[in-house]
């Protein structure tokens, strides 16, 4: 884990406590498997009330950073074993050097998942799948509009395919999905490339040609891979802000 001695940026007491604890875990000040200091000592060190600290500890425990042991010290978890994808934004903020790899993993996961569930959606309900493109003609040519349309399209296909687990994954990745989407879609050529993909997928849905889904997705990923490679090589340092 990378050492990062940046000044804490949080404003509220709860956010300050959370940032302090998370950064301390990431920098191995509180290494995995160790116990946190007592609530009293930790609250005094951070400068927050014990009530605020307790709320923060409970939230971090839900995210997998900690294990609260009643009557015993709070234990620091190995996040790679205990946490879920909902902490990805936090990881990117903690270590920008790891951000390209994490984002590349996320894009790969989306591609592999979508090949499966979009195929199922078109196969089982081509009409509902086609309806997901109802707003395509009105799609405004801006990074913000493309990012939102793209997120909703891929997410709603999980609904049509009756894949609730995939839908939850999209929910947990929404923040980072939108941030990198804005980076990708700020370029006109990227929007044009993606618009062509949408039109191809729309036609596949209209025809109910589920067998064409995987090939269409893979061709689009191949066409856009060079663009993504360039983006990941020059990620802005303020991506998580």
UniProtKB/Swiss-Prot annotation:
NCBIfam families: fadR_gamma, PRK04984.1. Residues 11-79 form the HTH gntR-type domain. It comes from Haemophilus influenzae (strain ATCC 51907 / DSM 11121 / KW20 / Rd). It holds the Pfam family FadR_C. PANTHER family: FATTY ACID METABOLISM REGULATOR PROTEIN (PTHR43537:SF52), TRANSCRIPTIONAL REGULATOR, GNTR FAMILY (PTHR43537). One of its GO terms (cellular component) is cytoplasm. Keywords: Activator, Cytoplasm, DNA-binding, Fatty acid metabolism, Lipid metabolism, Repressor, Transcription, Transcription regulation. GO terms for biological process: fatty acid metabolic process; regulation of fatty acid metabolic process. SMART domains: HTH_GNTR (SM00345). Homodimer. CDD domains: WHTH_GntR. The keyword Lipid metabolism applies. It is found in: Cytoplasm. This is Fatty acid metabolism regulator protein. GO terms for molecular function: DNA binding; DNA-binding transcription factor activity; fatty-acyl-CoA binding. Multifunctional regulator of fatty acid metabolism. InterPro entries: FA-response_TF_FadR, FadR_C, TF_FadR/GntR_C, Tscrpt_reg_HTH_GntR, WH-like_DNA-bd_sf, WH_DNA-bd_sf. Residues 39-58 bind DNA.
